[in-house]
Amino acid sequence: MKNKVVVLSDIHLSDNSPTSWYQKGIHQEYLLAIFEWVVSHSDEVSELVLLGDIVDFWTSPFDVVPPTFRHIVEQNELVLGPDGGLARVLDALDGAVTYVRGNHDMMVTEPDVTSISSSGDHHVKFAGDLYSPGNDPRVLLRHGNEYTMFNAPDLTTKFAPLPIGYFITRIVADYWHQHLAPGQNVSELEDQGYPNGLNWKSVVEDALRSLEISIADVLISGIAGKEDVAQTLPITLDDGSTTTLIEVRAEYRHLFTHWVEVNGGGEEGALVAVKAGLADYNSSFMGWFAQRQAFADHAQLVVMGHTHAPISGLAESLVNYVNSGFECPSVADLKTKTISFAVIAMDSLETTLFHAVKVGAEAPSIHPLVAPVASVVDVPGKDYSCYVVIDNTESSSDLTLIGHGLEHGHFINLPVSIRSGTSATLWLQDFPHVLSMHGSQGSVVYRDDRGRDYEFAFGCPKERHHIQCSGATTFRAKTGYGEWLAPNQVPSTGNPLFVMFTLTT
């Protein structure tokens, strides 16, 4: 039964120059082994989704024009050519290969993607930035850079849609261009093949502490200083024009304030902006963004790439988040990093991670991968949110939000309407401990088509106060990893709170 979707991201195919993360002499055999695994399982695989950063336009030194898509294909014929590994997958799956853009390939176009073809005259399909296999709304696939401050498309500068992360990656590439020994490439070094090309922990920490000044100033100056790269050097862009880091700093000077504004402004906007910065820094809060997206779009599973860190699930959530990992760890990092991909069973939405493993001189083989789970909070177990499902599937009336109250916390997802025959999830999250000692507590009022009002109240305290659940004719509740209690029973302790209210009018 062909019910499985394979998700592969972050290959970073480029021109195989010394500053390219992907080196075909190292990574190609692993990638081809994955493609052959897909071909050999074509009786059960319905589709291969290439989930962003498949090619890479970012890892060129300052004085080099980034490679074109055509040039990358020419440099990687055994992968992308008409008789290459991807072409074999195209023919085995009857053309069911779909390309979703990431950040390092955000300039890829539909004509670029569809130019990849097979001897069977199948072409890769282009899905833009967001994709649901088989138009199944339960599943959302996107690269994930959209949730990160330094790598999300930025439409506010003259370099749009390039984010500041593009220039950070160019800084690192220029540094290695100057410092690699003859015949050496970055895949031989530790801590390479990562979203921005280096371990920039201290620099990002400084940037995120500088909320009242330009994060771009701190970030660019800090990384350029660390890498000893002059900010006056010309940077050659893909159209042949040039810029400098001085100009880049000025263009992105409002980066943090822009993130605050587009996420609601004030304290709540600042919280989202900080999460977006931390998501780039150490992949934290990617689970938070995945859950927010799932609730907003009524999805059950979100699969992303971008972080280069495989994730097998989401702790204490009504939905699931999986990260497929990446395909270009450096040789020095292969003892701790792995070349991985995800497989979704579309009937159950169970998602399994696999990785390509090479032992000695043997060809790489494919094996299941055990990976950590993510959390929506930075300290697992410290989520004091209320997750509230209002089940309107048995009702003949639509519901419209007419009011809400907040004692503690803030709404991350608050549907303004719930159609008859559907359900919706509300998310009330507690503020971070440094801002509030309380958990979350609030209420909402919805009105149906007949003018009847329904109030739902809920609370998940941090201190020794009672958990609250009330409203509707029937509800069921639980906390944490506990079991759902009998109808209309309120948990005595635990966190976070999950409650499902059922309407039957």
Question: Where do the PLM segments sit?
Answer:
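Extended recognition/assembly regions associated with phosphoester-bond processing machinery
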Residues: M1-V370
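Intrinsically disordered, low-complexity segments enriched in small/polar residues
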Residues: A371-T505
